[in-house]
Amino acid sequence: MYKGFDRSVSLYRQACKVIPGGVNSPVRAFKAVGLNPVFVKKGEGARIYDFDDNEYIDYVCSWGPLILGHRHPRVVGALERCLNEVGTSFGAPTELENILAEMIVEAVPSIEMVRLVNSGTEAAMSALRLARGYTGRNKIVKFEGCYHGHADFLLIKAGSGALTFGVPTSPGIPAAAAAGTIVARYNDLAGLEEIFKLEGEDIAAVIVEPVAGNMGVVPPAPGFLEGLRNLTARYGSLLIFDEVITGFRLAYGGAQELYGVAPDLTCLGKVIGGGLPVGAYGGRREIMEQVAPSGPVYQAGTLSGNPLAVSAGIATLEVLKQPGVYGRLEQTAAALEDALKQAARQTGAEVCFNRAGSMLCAFFTGEEVKDYASACTSDTARYAAFFRSMLEQGVYLAPSQFEAAFVSLAHGKEEIERTAEAARHAFKAAVEQK
């Protein structure tokens, strides 16, 4: 039974005195849904609990990393062993780093060598520096609505016209940082071909989320990823898949296994740390050997490959490698999608559902969502009403229309049934939202 948010409100006020906006990442503030943030006390399996003793079925899963659920015994055991027998950090190589790197190389055919870092932002930033160093070119292409971390030259929105050189999206980003970034429309291969006709000889790389997961969930159109592969190869540019979200989530080999397209470089994060801070970038040996100390492209990190994150990552991948795991995730996610669709139909809610494997999104729009522009037709006020109703009924979703919901191995029939029942009331609340 819903018990209110008094303790969370008190903690938020306390946080606002010492933390900008009261949170350490903006979306956590719940501004888009008109609430104060829920302060989480603990997690277990598919559930989280707040400081007012409310219980929630969790579909945020720490924004994707917790594919096994909260406090999975294998991960907890690995962390305990690491703390008791190894340590937290050395700033020196460990055998654990070798093990995780070998597991990644074995899992992802396009990766022959991999470098561990501390976050998805570091992975994308480093991969793009490497692409520029390897090709000797300066410009990059990203896609509208795709997020690759908060490095200056990646926090860019589209300009106007066919060739859309970027415009900074945040104060503090110099115009010069955006000058080398070209923004294209996701799923628009013809538009990208026009960009390459004009600038192709200067483009070092195209970076893309193979399934966009930061404007909701937007899968690639048939032939889009294949077209990117062919176009970049034709012009001698590198293709970079940002699989920070999709890596080891959509398949053991990531989105590139699912869609059968091999990039030159891949960015990883989230799942490979089992809930601890981590990132990685990897690719063909001839490219990766340009990274220092093997080559001249510099990248470093004090806590890169730290034993705790690596131990949690190894334990997570060991579970994911077991037979039938991704079939179970697919079955659960499909059941959730079907249940939500049925609830929406019963209430007359106008919703577009997109799903790729165990990540999905309910867009409050009557349009097919295939890119950033169509995602932006969503009625965010209706989503906020839906979110608030679900939260009060014990279902924790992303506090933004433009984020994914994630299914973990801890979710099962009971969670789906409870979510479906809550959704029937929540979609009704959304329909009644003025």
Curated annotation (Swiss-Prot):
<keyword id="KW-0627">Porphyrin biosynthesis</keyword>
<dbReference type="GO" id="GO:0005737">
    <property type="term" value="C:cytoplasm"/>
</dbReference>
<keyword id="KW-0963">Cytoplasm</keyword>
<keyword id="KW-0663">Pyridoxal phosphate</keyword>
<dbReference type="Pfam" id="PF00202">
    <property type="entry name" value="Aminotran_3"/>
</dbReference>
<keyword id="KW-0413">Isomerase</keyword>
<feature type="modified residue" description="N6-(pyridoxal phosphate)lysine">
    <location>
        <position position="270"/>
    </location>
</feature>
<dbReference type="InterPro" id="IPR049704">
    <property type="entry name" value="Aminotrans_3_PPA_site"/>
</dbReference>
<dbReference type="InterPro" id="IPR015424">
    <property type="entry name" value="PyrdxlP-dep_Trfase"/>
</dbReference>
<dbReference type="GO" id="GO:0006782">
    <property type="term" value="P:protoporphyrinogen IX biosynthetic process"/>
</dbReference>
<dbReference type="GO" id="GO:0042286">
    <property type="term" value="F:glutamate-1-semialdehyde 2,1-aminomutase activity"/>
</dbReference>
<dbReference type="InterPro" id="IPR004639">
    <property type="entry name" value="4pyrrol_synth_GluAld_NH2Trfase"/>
</dbReference>
<dbReference type="InterPro" id="IPR005814">
    <property type="entry name" value="Aminotrans_3"/>
</dbReference>
<comment type="subunit">
    <text>Homodimer.</text>
</comment>
<protein>
    <recommendedName>
        <fullName>Glutamate-1-semialdehyde 2,1-aminomutase</fullName>
        <ecNumber>5.4.3.8</ecNumber>
    </recommendedName>
</protein>
<dbReference type="GO" id="GO:0030170">
    <property type="term" value="F:pyridoxal phosphate binding"/>
</dbReference>
<dbReference type="InterPro" id="IPR015422">
    <property type="entry name" value="PyrdxlP-dep_Trfase_small"/>
</dbReference>
<comment type="similarity">
    <text>Belongs to the class-III pyridoxal-phosphate-dependent aminotransferase family. HemL subfamily.</text>
</comment>
<dbReference type="InterPro" id="IPR015421">
    <property type="entry name" value="PyrdxlP-dep_Trfase_major"/>
</dbReference>
<comment type="pathway">
    <text>Porphyrin-containing compound metabolism; protoporphyrin-IX biosynthesis; 5-aminolevulinate from L-glutamyl-tRNA(Glu): step 2/2.</text>
</comment>
<dbReference type="GO" id="GO:0008483">
    <property type="term" value="F:transaminase activity"/>
</dbReference>
